[in-house]
């Protein structure tokens, strides 16, 4: 039997190894071990800590799993105030900020600044004592916030213990400030899952981050895709810094995530250049930003400048123009989804929002309509952020004429006339018709989509014809369509029929993640499909999986696991899969990540590609173990430049990143 001292050494070794692999996975996007190996290390640690509880410490990775739910959040006092920033709304106001600094300092010398994107998230304050995380709190009123330490511990991008790879002494105590946020893609997927479960969606990524962080049950926070960028420190005891950029360098060295777009610049003119650059880059970033922050770099000057009211003189938040506009709701229609969910959609007078013309906006569900009191004929404020679907923020009640018409989701399905029900505990109304053509149409559209089987030429109108003519009753029927049956459909000539049948034949050997996505399993989007494909490698292995196997995979919780198991237990679904197999549909076995030729490499595509679409290029990269990103960063290995390549190419050239032509990329990927 292991003695206590041996257990202590094993526990310390396991903690160090797990935190190392956490950083490789969550911060560097470069894992060295499989999920199964990681889970084995974690379970070994948990077992040892249970056997030897005297060695269970606050910085243990086992603490990330989540403690017992709280009844309420306790207050947490910050060691130093978390001040709010004054705002600048134009380039002239940015110049005035610089003039104010020089007047106060009685100096005309050019100042050095640090500029950074202003993340639209939730500000938090972390306190580390002797290198160990002891408290995590929301900003609150600036003097005290809510103690959310249990939830903070579940975020893998936040070290439980400061990493120190040198002999340099760590601060005795330090406050680390940062912004907790949710990436736009993760936000969309979270809302998709919530809508599918009949839960109200979050209005925007910031609200989703705030709601996820302020969960009394930390296990819920642990399942939400939260991340954090650190941008400053408060009280520091036992360590001195000279410049703000030194602080950021130390934070990175200690294992914290710092935004890669932060820059040190000389003079206010360079700040304005960065402000313009960020506005151009804004919609390409994987997270939402609502401006830029400028800070005086010299910490001694920050001290001299001090604060006025509740804002520091040495920093300013430079806001972007709002991505909102007003318009009028002309009508409200109801769409029926593939799971039978009825979604109300506002048809609006077209209006430009964030540079894009918007004429439709989702209203989510009846609760959302009632809460905002949205009526046909209302003047409303609509919002569009990044590529998120436009939404109605609020009604301009003062514009009402009295002729506006309240809206209620119908009691019968607008597609098939079946009864519409709302199950207890759900926000969604659902059609319960077993043969609802709208549900089948949506299911087939999902199956043949680019993210699924990617069958070219099978558009929405043709799918509707196939369903209405009762030529298909499930996705597998597509592979049994005859030449003559297709030729009898509207606008289908000999050539178009031949092309469609060829496209259907070509789709028979997709990558495994594509067929998993195409099946339409509830809560399983493209991201989870890729995770499942990497883990199980064949469809049969996934079909025969167990709950324990699924729950051992990071990013898959009880809800997703239950949905997967229920799908494959369903006799009707199993029959469809058997029909697909008999038709010759056979997904390619997923390559082990370790043997894939592009493993660990990150690609960015820019310009127009002539031999493939961007999505096809991305699929090639991911199928060979690499990653496709939207922006050029220090982590980028290759930029693939097509015709009329833009700023991404210039940035890559300046950074010395390898540039590939489309042909060179295809050769590297083994496609030519």
UniProtKB/Swiss-Prot annotation:
Annotated disulfide bonds: none
GO cellular component, one term: cytosol
Gene3D superfamilies in the cross-refs: 5' to 3' exonuclease, C-terminal subdomain, 6.20.10.30, BRCT domain, DNA ligase/mRNA capping enzyme, Helix hairpin bin, Nucleic acid-binding proteins
Cofactor: Mg(2+); Mn(2+)
Entry annotation: catalytic residues: 118 (n6-amp-lysine intermediate)
Molecular function in Gene Ontology: DNA ligase (NAD+) activity; metal ion binding
Keywords: DNA damage, DNA repair, DNA replication, Ligase, Magnesium, Manganese, Metal-binding, NAD, Zinc
Main enzyme class: ligase
InterPro entries tied to this protein: BRCT_dom (IPR001357), BRCT_dom_sf (IPR036420), DisA/LigA_HHH (IPR041663), DNA_ligase (IPR001679), DNA_ligase_AS (IPR018239), DNA_ligase_CS (IPR033136), DNAligase_adenylation (IPR013839), DNAligase_N (IPR013840)
EC number, as in UniProt: 6.5.1.2
Annotated residues for binding of Zn(2+): 413, 416, 431, 436
Catalytically driven reaction(s): NAD(+) + (deoxyribonucleotide)n-3'-hydroxyl + 5'-phospho-(deoxyribonucleotide)m = (deoxyribonucleotide)n+m + AMP + beta-nicotinamide D-nucleotide
Protein name: DNA ligase
Organism per entry: Syntrophus aciditrophicus (strain SB)
Organism lineage string: Bacteria, Pseudomonadati, Thermodesulfobacteriota, Syntrophia, Syntrophales
